[in-house]
Curated annotation (Swiss-Prot):
GO CC annotation, single: plasma membrane
Keywords in alphabetical order: 4Fe-4S, Cell inner membrane, Cell membrane, Iron, Iron-sulfur, Membrane, Metal-binding, NAD, Quinone, Repeat, Translocase, Ubiquinone
UniProt organism field: Blochmanniella floridana
SUPFAM superfamilies: 4Fe-4S ferredoxins (SSF54862)
Name of the gene encoding the protein in the UniProt record: nuoI
Name by which UniProt lists this protein: NADH-quinone oxidoreductase subunit I
Cell location: Cell inner membrane
Reactions the enzyme catalyzes: a quinone + NADH + 5 H(+)(in) = a quinol + NAD(+) + 4 H(+)(out)
Residues that bind [4Fe-4S] cluster 2: C71, C100, C103, C106
Lineage top rank: taxon: Bacteria
Keyword Iron included in the entry's annotation: yes
């Protein structure tokens, strides 16, 4: 009697398994075939780093080195140089994407909005040396996310013919010698 009961339980179990496999075989897929179907990324997705230009077409980067200091893995290196007008620019700007963790700290630290993270994530390569991007690889032709922001219009730049004038609401600086007893 026990053997007959086990036999029917095993038969029912087999049919149930075949039914479940058949239902899953013809149902909608949960996974997407990646190269054929593009992934939908969030608007705040942090992908590859790019260097942007201002509205005049100049590089926004002033080589302040804040991005390299704020990078937790130290994948950014640059060297500051100065042109004839007194404007700073990076002589070289290098990012090692094999070390980059795409945290966005460099983008937050950049005062000129020169560094921006875009939604490009397809960066795999066979050689690590090909993942070291130079300034020419990183520079894009447009302003990126912040189209109207111009660092030099806000902060100024040292030009020989530019002078600083006092504002009407600004108080005169206090002289330390006059307040001493």
């Amino acid at each position: 009697m026990m053997k007959l009961k086990e036999f029917f339980i095993n038969i029912i179990s087999i049919f149930r398994s075949v039914y479940m496999v058949g239902m899953q075989a013809f149902s909608k897929r949960e996974t997407y075939m990646y190269p054929d179907v593009a992934c939908k990324l969030s608007s705040r997705y942090r992908g590859r780093i790019v260097l942007t230009r201002d509205s005049a077409g100049h590089e926004r980067c002033v080589a302040c080195n804040l991005c390299a200091v704020s990078c937790p893995v130290g994948c950014i290196s640059l060297k500051k140089s100065e042109n004839s007008e007194g404007r700073w620019y990076p002589e070289f700007f290098r990012i090692n994407f094999s070390r980059c963790i795409f945290c966005g700290m460099c983008e937050e630290a950049c005062p000129t909005a020169a560094i921006q993270l875009i939604s490009d994530f397809e960066m795999s390569d066979y050689k690590r040396s090909d993942l070291v991007y130079e300034k020419s690889d990183l520079l894009i032709s447009g302003p990126g996310k912040y189209k109207n922001y111009d660092f030099y219009q806000i902060s100024g730049v040292k030009y020989s013919n530019k002078y600083k004038k006092e504002s009407s609401f600004e108080e005169k600086p206090i002289s330390v010698k006059t307040i001493l007893p």
